[in-house]
């Protein structure tokens, strides 16, 4: 069931648009495709997480606590320099070899195990265990090049898994020559009235003072458009059909049109409006190729939808030395997320090293009981537990009131 459509009859037009605007920035998906299961599971995890976890101080920073509603966790600089480069150096120091600018083409399968993997360059890779941890759109193509593999249990799920296509989530940056201040720390924004479901964050709020924003740049906003099928007001075109210049003009128009955003800017900048701050440059992430025939990205992004949830494969496959990993595989996290990706990696590692421990997702006892009851109702074809329980409570109160009234009359 589509989450947005399930809530539409219950909300006003303004409340509905505000509610679904949270789906892109928070859940990381297009609100037109988000299932009720995915939305419910995501927000439940945000509200009902375990008690706060204390992180000890180390050479990277002071001690801090992570818990429900802690806010966005952010790096203190650009992702490559402050995260990926450090991990790359660490893995190389441990003996990991990377083959850059190479693509996996197919697996060699002898009917019992994987005997090797061939790259598009022709290079053959041999290993005791092969872990397929790439996005499922490419994985589906790779597996289909070896029909004997593609028809096996779990591996045969990939074509159905990607049936809804990728989620188009376009990243962009807006640079200003003057510093734009915000009324509170770590002010992250969802532009709820934007057709493209825009979300924004000003990086200078958290980046270290010695990190360069760019020559002559005092404020650097990073943003994302999360919905690709809703037409913008300026050109009447959705993201999927815009040219790059049209996309940029739509972004500017939607931001300048947002009264709530402008009110925040005026509050923190002595009454100055957003329009008075000159934009020096707007840059769209280089991997996106715009075309009237449809936008395409080099790394198609998979997310849960109303059609794909049940097709998620397990990490284990019928081939003993082929393991799957990624947020598109089945996990206890149960929704496409960084947490699911990490968990899938632990589960894949445990298949190689059985002593690896996979931490279960936290679910309170009352929620587990409620979920089991709802599963029972589903098997019976009965309404959702949130419909049945309130109805049962009302009926129970009526019965109790009737019994009390009858007892009073007899007395």
Language-model regions: role of each:
Residues 1-110:
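Active-site/ligand-binding neighborhood in enzyme catalytic cores
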Residues 1-26, 249, 253-278, 294, ...:
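Rossmann-like nucleotide/phosphate-binding core characteristic of flavoprotein oxidoreductases
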Residues 6, 82-93, 246-258, 344-351:
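Amphipathic alpha-helical segments that form well-ordered structural scaffolds
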Residues 54-75, 127-129, 134-343:
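C-terminal segments that line or cap access tunnels to active or ligand-binding sites in enzymes
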Residues 94, 126-131, 349-357:
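Short, hydrophobic alpha-helical segments
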Residues 107-125:
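Conserved beta-strand-loop-beta-strand element in the redox core of flavoprotein oxidoreductases
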Residues 123, 138-140, 160-161, 378-385:
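Acidic/histidine-rich catalytic neighborhood
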Residues 301-411:
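C-terminal lid/capping helical subdomain adjacent to the catalytic/cofactor pocket in oxidative enzymes
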């Amino acid at each position: 069931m589509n989450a947005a459509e399930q809530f539409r009859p219950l909300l006003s037009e303004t409340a509905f648009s505000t509610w679904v605007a949270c789906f892109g920035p928070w859940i990381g998906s297009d609100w037109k495709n988000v299932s009720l299961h995915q939305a419910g599971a995501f927000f439940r995890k945000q509200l009902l997480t375990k008690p706060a976890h204390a992180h000890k101080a180390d050479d990277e920073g002071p001690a801090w606590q992570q818990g429900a509603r802690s806010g966005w966790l952010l790096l203190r600089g650009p992702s490559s320099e402050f995260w990926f480069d450090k991990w790359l150096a660490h893995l190389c120091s441990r003996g990991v070899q990377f083959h850059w600018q190479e693509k996996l083409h197919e697996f060699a399968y002898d009917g019992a195990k994987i005997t090797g993997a061939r790259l598009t360059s022709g290079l053959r890779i041999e290993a005791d265990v092969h872990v397929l941890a790439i996005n499922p759109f490419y994985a589906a193509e790779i597996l289909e090049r070896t029909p004997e593999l593609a028809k096996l249990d779990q591996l045969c799920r990939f074509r159905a898994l990607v049936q809804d296509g990728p989620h188009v989530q376009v990243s962009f940056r807006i640079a200003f020559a003057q510093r734009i201040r915000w009324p509170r720390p770590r002010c992250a924004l969802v532009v709820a009235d934007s057709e493209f479901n825009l979300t924004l964050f000003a990086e200078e709020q958290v980046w270290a003072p010695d990190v360069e924003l760019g020559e002559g740049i005092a404020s650097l906003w990073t943003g994302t458009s999360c919905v690709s099928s809703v037409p913008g007001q300026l050109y009447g075109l959705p993201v999927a059909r815009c040219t790059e210049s049209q996309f940029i003009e739509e972004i500017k128009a939607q931001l300048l049109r947002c009264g709530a955003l402008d009110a925040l800017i005026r509050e923190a900048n002595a009454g100055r409006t957003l329009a008075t701050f000159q934009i020096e440059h707007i840059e769209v992430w280089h991997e996106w190729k715009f075309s009237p025939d449809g936008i395409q990205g080099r790394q198609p992004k998979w997310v849960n939808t109303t059609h794909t949830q049940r097709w998620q494969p397990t990490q284990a496959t019928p081939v003993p030395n082929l393991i799957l990993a990624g947020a598109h595989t089945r996990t206890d996290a149960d929704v496409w997320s960084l947490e699911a990706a990490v968990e899938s990696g632990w589960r894949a590692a445990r298949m190689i090293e059985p002593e690896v421990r996979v931490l279960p997702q936290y679910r309170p006892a009352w929620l587990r009981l409620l979920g089991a009851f709802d599963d029972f109702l589903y098997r019976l074809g009965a309404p959702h537990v949130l419909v049945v329980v309130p109805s049962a409570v009302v009926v129970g109160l009526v019965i109790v009131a009737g019994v009390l009234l009858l007892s009073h009359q007899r007395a």
